[in-house]
Design a protein with these regions (language model features):
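Active-site-adjacent structural elements in enzyme catalytic cores
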Residues: 1-118
Length: 118
């Protein structure tokens, strides 16, 4: 999975990015999520962890980070345990904010015109 951060324009509602000047787009690698997106269109939602905390590896791990019960589909087999790579393309040069499943080398191989910060 890959999350791409871009500069937000005036078409991005305040409630989507809390008024920040950037917005993130996550490209999932999950059959059920891709099917849902195909049927309903784009989805908007936060990460399933508290900012700065490690991502849960099981639904119960995710639920334990929050102080209330969370509705959801418990499908622990679908969790890979590997976070998405966060690629920031909002500046002059690309930056990887979090290394995940997709490496900088793979990005450069597939899209050689992307220039990274040193």
């Amino acid at each position: 999975p890959l999350t791409i951060i871009l500069k937000a324009n005036d078409n991005v509602p305040f409630w989507v990015n809390s008024g920040l000047d950037t917005v993130g787009f996550r490209v999932p690698n999950h059959v059920k999520t891709l099917q849902l997106i195909s049927e309903t269109g784009p989805l908007i939602g936060p990460s399933a962890n508290i900012s700065g905390n490690e991502s849960g590896k099981k639904f119960s791990d995710i639920q334990a980070q929050f102080s209330v019960d969370l509705p959801g589909i418990e499908d622990d087999q679908a969790l890979t345990g590997i976070d998405s790579t966060i690629l920031d393309l909002s500046g002059q040069k690309a930056r990887i904010l979090r290394q995940g499943a997709i490496s900088r080398e793979l990005i450069q191989k597939e899209i050689p015109e992307i220039e990274f910060e040193d």
